[in-house]
Amino acid sequence: MASADMSPSRSHPHDATRSPSPRTQSPSPRDEDGSRSPGERTPSPPSRDPSPYRSPGERTPSPSPRRDRSLSPRDQPHSHPRSRSPTPRSQSPSRRSVRSPSPRQGSPARRVDRSSSPRARSPPPRRHSRSPPLRGQPPPPRHRDAGGDYRPVRKERTPTPPPVAVKTEEEKLADARAEYQKLLNLRSQGVYLPPHRLRALQAAITDKKTREYQRMAWEALKKSVNGLVNKVNTANIKFVVPELFGENLIRGRGLFCQSLLKAQHASLPFTPIYACLAAICNTKLPQVGELLVKRLVLRFRKAFKRNDKAVCLSSTMFIAHLVNNQVVHEMIAAQILLLLLAKPTDDSVEIAVGLMREVGLFLEEMSPAIAHAVFDQFRNILHEADIDRRTQYMIEVLFQVRKDKYKDNPVIKEELDLVEEEDQITHRIGLDDEIDPQDGLNVFKMDPNWEENEEEYKKLKAEILGEASDDDEDDDDDDESESGSESEDEEQKALEIKDQSNADLVNLRRTIYLSIQSSADPEEAAHKLMKLRLPAGQEAELVSMIVESCAQEKVYLKFMGLLGERFARLNRMWMDLFEESFAKYYSTIHRYETNKLRNIARFFGHLLATDAIGWHVFSVIHLNEEETTSASRIFIKILFEDLQENIGSAKLKARMSEETLQPSLQGIFPHDEPRNIRFSINYFTSIKMGYLTDEMRTFLANMPKPALPAPPADSDSESVSSYSSYSSYSSRSRSRSLTPRKDTRGRSLSRTPPRRGRGRSYSRTPSRSRSRSRSYSRSVSKSVSRSPPRRRAVESRSPSPPPRGRGRSYDRYSRSPSRSRSRTRSPAAAPPIRRGRSGTRSRSRSYSRSPSPPPARGYPTRGRAPVSNNDRAAAASGKRRREGSYSASRSPHPPPQQRLRRGSYSRSRSRSPIPIRGNGPAGRDTGRAGPAPARGGRRNRSYSRSRTRSPPPLADAATGSRRVVSRSPSPVVGNNKRRRSYSSSRSRSRSSSRSRYRSRSPVAKRGRVD
């Protein structure tokens, strides 16, 4: 114990206990893992202690209960080599222990092991020892530093960085530009750049005069123009155009044209839309349209040289639609077409067909000569060129499209017709002109006057879009805006939205239809409909629904007619609405099927029959071949049949004859052209209402007929008759005589069989004759016709009285036009013919191949032929020389000049008796077969040969083939003496038409008019 008690007394008073110090009063600046703070000092190595080594958990047997902190040998840097398992604190290089005096020799060293238990569980250290001090020992002094060598550790101060120099704005902009340029270069190399970095750098660049800012604006312009062009369509073109003008199109016109060409080549069906967009821009900025046309033409030229079919097709289609919009003159389209068709190949013809389909209607309207030339070239290629069958079919389809008036290829669609014709500016650019495409406009170039140009375009944009006036109006509205005006605007917008949806109109129609269908009789239906509150201006919808309800029924219901009559009789407003609906439905009647058409016609027929609407509505009907369709003709037929059924034929005719209605009926019963008159007559005759056309028939019969000009007498001539009221025929006549007499026109005008008396025979067949005449006492006539054979052959013998006095021959009435050539030989010294007796011998052969025209009105058919006063005067005086060659045969002969219809060829050889006057002067031509011989009874022999290419005359009883062989004595009267001459005539003809000898009226009563 003594040794134990003395050991603490030997120690230094400072070593026994720690005096309170700031470091001892505060917790140790160790981390929770036991390491010390860097500020603590590392204690010096303690002196050797001879006392045996104590375990970490062993305490010193000091009587004082005070705990002292001392470093164990494990905690010292130079620990005993026998120390085992050092704690982690001894291995930490940053651990620094507090220096404390080591215990003296012989005194046990007190150790406190803090690693055995956590700090949270260890009791707090005692600050002061509770035990009294040892005897004979002064109390230990209390120092703040708790030892002579203890000093608080100073914290190491980090060196302050040098002050950063503040950059100026110019330096910041320079750095941003450099960074932006670096990023652009990286992006051009394919490196991905985050968009936010680019946006941040772009926001930092604000100087508009710099190259980087203008390049950013150029990229934004390019992106915007390209996006607007790509999203345009028919529905939004009106909204895209203002946005497009919002961009600087003068600066970006190259970009705009480039985007248009790319988009059009990629999507050909949108070509009309792109052409319309270009036309709108061309009205305000002509340089844009001109640049587009130049690039298109240059593009076509390059593609044509490279044989690039796809680019040629797209370019020609775009040019065609620009021509339709009048952006470029149509001459460029004509030049391209002629270039493609100059050396036709399958591809070039296909491109030309596509171009012509698009621009054909415009060329037909504006330049018909170009269109005709192009189609002639197509026709030649189709017939002569060696092209593929597919290409031939394409040309045939093109001709069919032309025949259909380009119904599927209009010039401009209605929804794209946004440019007024007078506002359009047309450029004239030829296919062979020198063209500058201005490719430099596609790339970025720095503009030193960038701000000035932008200001100028802003002014131009304000003029185009009217922004200035709009801004002023907006300012005024803002100054005077109130809550009431805002509410009115909202209500107006709401109403506009409702109008666009047509919901109210659909509901109104549904209500009207249900009211009609739920009614038992017309009065109830009218009462229900009158109770409906129709919106203002929607009265026409009620009328339309009544007609539509009637049309959709399977059969016509009189219920609907009575309902319409009830409304039409209410007041004048409803009557006018029904009359307007009549005109509307007649103009659109071709849209309805036959059953609906029938119901609508009977509905309006009921309204007209009951006088619910005025009959002046017939003014909208024009009954002719051009202005009617099959549907409209069916509508008129059913309408008039219903009128006839309701009011009767007599009343209908009387109503149609009223003077007050005649102006309104001019379209149904026309009096303008014979063609329209005949069409109306035939139409009403076909629907068994010919009695309505009596007045038109009379008018048609009395219409003046154009007269033919008289040809010269001593020359070969041709006369062509104009169209008469029935039909048109052309006639040619030529006469040449080989006799000593003058050349004259030989005509035989006959419609009746031969009779006595002085008369001129009339025929409808012109003849061309050359005559040489010799007269004999006997005549034989043979006629051969090249027409289908007749059904029967008839032989007859009958007396044929020749004409009296002048000796003119009479032919049967012939309805077939003929052109005859006859040769008559007349010897110089013919035997004299005795007074009052003469004979001719003729042989005639005729061929006919033409349909015979109907007889003209007013010609005598049976009986004595009319004789003109001039003929009587010439016969009485005997001084007038009759010239010409006449043949007495039953072959057709020419009509008078003013009645000529059609010329045909006839060649005949005839021998026939020629009646002459006994007291006529010598050398006078008194017969029709040739000139008569002088007095003394000389005989004249006549040969005539005729060939007729026309069908023989129509007959009353006989049709088909007919062969007539006749022998008849012909009494000849001259100077009150009657002589007989015998003529033998034989005719054979084949005809495909009927012969009629009786008179035929030009318009049969209530029959079809040809």
From Swiss-Prot:
Compositional bias ranges of the Low complexity kind: 18-28, 84-109, 718-732, 776-787, 911-935, 961-973
InterPro entries in alphabetical order: ARM-type_fold, CWC22_splicing_factor, Initiation_fac_eIF4g_MI, MIF4G-like_typ-3
Main location class: cytoplasm
Start-end of Basic residues biased regions: 753-775, 834-846, 899-910, 936-948, 976-1010
Listed Basic and acidic residues bias regions: 29-39, 65-78, 142-158
Keyword terms, alphabetized: Cytoplasm, mRNA processing, mRNA splicing, Nucleus, Spliceosome
Domain named MIF4G: residues: 222-405
Domain named MI: residues: 507-623
Ranges of Polar residues composition bias in the record: 1-10
Region named Disordered: 1-166, 466-498, 708-1010
Listed GO CC annotations: catalytic step 2 spliceosome; cytoplasm
GO terms, biological process: mRNA splicing, via spliceosome
GO molecular function: RNA binding
Protein location: Cytoplasm; Nucleus
Compositionally biased residues, Acidic residues: 468-491
Pfam family, one: MIF4G
Self-association and partners: Associated with the spliceosome.
Family: Belongs to the CWC22 family.
PANTHER family with a match to the protein in the record: CELL CYCLE CONTROL PROTEIN CWF22-RELATED, PRE-MRNA-SPLICING FACTOR CWC22 HOMOLOG
Role noted for this protein: Involved in pre-mRNA splicing.
Protein name from the UniProt record: Pre-mRNA-splicing factor cwc22
Gene name of this polypeptide: msp-1
